[in-house]
Structure formats: structure tokens, C-alpha cells
């Protein structure tokens, strides 16, 4: 959108790995994130972004990125179906066996 105006553009960097960033335009694009030093030497990020889809609905994603990887969350992301009952039962049995100290190589 050529006519979009920047409404917000705020940046703060402490220089020690801590930072905050926020950006918003008049056409509905928005992003914000914060960062902190991570326990494994990485930079931990937490944030969100949103934009308007062609049908007028708002797409929004929140996320965490840390030593466990990128972990997005959104109603737009596909969700796998639940495991069938027999698989759920097998997982319960495995958890019970681990609690009893049983291990499998």
C-alpha cells in the first residue's frame, strides 16, 4: 500500500542484549518484539505481528523464540488432529513405566 503512513516506529536497545521494537502502519500492519539474553548464549525473542488479509480479516501471530526454537501461536496455524485413543493409552502406559523406572534401549 503506497499510501500507508507509519504510525509508530519505536526502538530501544540497551546494548546488553535487551531490546524492544514496535512498528505500526495506517494500513493495519503491526509488529512488536522484545529480546533478552538467553541462558544458552542465544537471544530470546517474544513478540507478535498482524496484518489484514484480502478478505478484511486480521491475521495475527504471537511467538516466542528461544533455546527451544521458534514457537508461533495463531488461530491461522494448522492444528494436528488428536492422537487416536489407542495411541493415547500407549503414551499413558509409557509414562507409567517411566515413573516406575522402566527404560527401553
Swiss-Prot record:
An annotated GO cellular component: chitin-based extracellular matrix
Provenance organism: Homarus americanus
Organs and tissues of expression: Arthrodial membrane.
Region (Disordered): 1-21
Lineage: Eukaryota, Metazoa, Ecdysozoa, Arthropoda, Crustacea
TM annotation in the entry: none
Sorted UniProt keywords: Cuticle
Domain Chitin-binding type R&R per the UniProt entry, residue ranges: 16-81
Protein name: Cuticle protein AMP1B
One Pfam entry name: Chitin_bind_4
GO molecular function: structural constituent of chitin-based larval cuticle
Domain of life assignment: Eukaryota
